[in-house]
Regions:
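Acidic catalytic motifs of isoprenoid enzymes
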Residues: 1-174
Length: 174
């Protein structure tokens, strides 16, 4: 899947210590490709959800200590499995991301801020929490602050992309 993204990730990843970069790249690749499955292209919803379920099966295989046997996904999930094992990353955070991306496939509007906040809890906050795990810095205070930052960045992204999202039939502003 080839989609251009206007993100700062390539530059930001250079600011990470070299020992963390492979794990950061694996997390990013997982999140970026799963989000693209949900949001990009013209595949029907049933196909998008099936691909996201392939990601769920791969995560389950990682939890069981097994290799994922899909040759197309094996490189991504082999790298992710190494990062999960090396840093003790909670697989549930990756599931939260997949739940949010699956929600993107069918949900186009949010009734209120509480509903939108719940979406941010699953679509943005897991990334900050995973980074805190990499740095072994997941104190309650850090987790709370990370969640605030990640939710804020997600909301800013929604406001920046209002026109693009409206063209796709999605409205994130309650």
């Amino acid at each position: 899947m080839s989609v251009d993204h206007y993100e700062n990730f390539p530059v930001a990843s250079l600011l990470c210590p070299p020992a963390l970069r492979p794990a950061v790249r694996a997390i990013y690749h997982f999140a970026r490709t799963a989000d693209d499955i949900a949001d990009e292209g013209d595949a029907p919803p049933v196909v998008r959800l099936a691909h996201l379920n392939d990601y769920r099966r791969a995560l389950h295989a990682i939890e069981l200590g097994k290799a994922y046997d899909d040759p197309g996904l094996a490189p991504l999930f082999d790298r992710l499995a190494r990062a999960i094992r090396q840093f003790g990353l909670p697989v549930g955070l990756f599931r939260d991301l997949l739940d949010a991306f699956s929600q993107d496939v069918g949900k186009t509007r949010y009734a209120d801020f509480a509903e939108l906040s719940d979406y941010c809890r699953r679509s943005a906050n897991p990334v900050g929490r995973l980074l805190l795990c990499l740095y072994n810095a997941e104190t309650p205070d850090n987790l709370r602050r990370s969640d605030w930052i990640c939710t804020s960045l997600q909301l800013i992204n929604f406001w920046q992309d209002v026109a693009v999202d409206m063209q796709k039939g999605r409205i994130y502003l309650p």
